[in-house]
Amino acid sequence: MAAIRASFLLAAAALLALWCSDHGGVVASDPSHLQDLCVADKASTVRVNGVACKDGEDVAAEDFFFSGLHMAGNTTNKQGSAVTAVNVAQVPGLNTLGISLARIDYALHGLNPPHTHPRATEILTVLEGSLYVGFVTSNPENKLFTKVINKGDVFVFPKGLVHFQFNYGTTDAVAIVALSSQNPGVITVANAVFGSKPSITDDILAKAFQVEKTVVDQIQAKF
C-alpha cells in the first residue's frame, strides 16, 4: 500500500510539473482574452488589473487604429532619443491582446538609457543606422550581452532585464520594437534610483554605490 501511495504521489508531482511547464508562459504574461474584443473604456471608473471593456455597440474601427509612426520623434534632449509608443493608451483595441509597439529615434550618439520593461519581452528591428545594444542578466552573474546591429537586423531583450541601445553609427538611427504586453511599463534605472519622489536618502545611495554622499547629491541634482 505504501508503495502504491508513493507511486501515486510521484505521478501526481510529475503531472503538476508538466502542467506548470505548459502553462507557465500564460501565467507570467498578460491574461488571455475571453471574447473577440475588449476595447479599453478610458472613461470607466472601474478599477481592474487592466482596463474595463467598452460596450460592444460603441466600438469603432478607430479604436484599433494609430497614425504617426512615419514621423520622427523629437531627439533634442539630453539623451538624444525619442520613443513613440503604441500601446493600449494610444490604441484602446489592444486591451487584452498582449502586444504593443513603439518607434525609437536616435540622434547621432543618441542613447535609450538602461531601463527595464517589467511586464514584457522586447524584440527590436533596426530600420536605419547602426545601434550598439545590450542587456544584463540578473544577480549574481550580472552578465552583459552586447552586439552592434545594423539595418534589417533583429535583437531580443528578455522580459524584465536591464537593457539599452546606443546610436553607434555616423547618422541618425531608427528602430521599431514590439513588446509582449499591452502595457509593458518602463523603469529607467537612473530616473528610478536618483530621481524618485520622494528621493532615496543619500546615505542609502552612498552606501549602495560605495561613493561619498556629495557625489550622490550631485547626481540627484540632475534629476
UniProtKB/Swiss-Prot annotation:
Cystine crosslinks: C38-C53
Highest rank taxon of the organism: Eukaryota
Cell compartment(s), UniProt: Secreted, Extracellular space, Apoplast
InterPro entries on file: Cupin_1, Germin, Germin_Mn-BS, RmlC-like_jellyroll, RmlC_Cupin_sf
Residues the record lists as binding Mn(2+): H115, H117, E122, H163
Residue ranges constituting the Cupin type-1 domain according to the UniProt record: 67-217
A Pfam family annotated for this UniProt entry: Cupin_1
GO cellular component: apoplast
Residues carrying covalently attached carbohydrate according to the record: N74
Keyword field contains Secreted: yes
Spans traversing the lipid bilayer: none
Residues of the signal peptide: 1-28
Entry-linked SMART domains: Cupin_1
Gene3D superfamilies assigned: Jelly Rolls (2.60.120.10)
An example Gene Ontology molecular-function term: manganese ion binding
Keywords on record: Apoplast, Disulfide bond, Glycoprotein, Manganese, Metal-binding, Secreted, Signal
Keyword Disulfide bond in annotation: yes
The protein's assembly and partners: Oligomer (believed to be a pentamer but probably hexamer).
UniProt record similarity statement: Belongs to the germin family.
Task of the protein: May play a role in plant defense. Probably has no oxalate oxidase activity even if the active site is conserved.
Protein name per Swiss-Prot or TrEMBL: Putative germin-like protein 2-3
Species, as recorded: Oryza sativa subsp. japonica
Species classification: Eukaryota, Viridiplantae, Streptophyta, Embryophyta, Tracheophyta
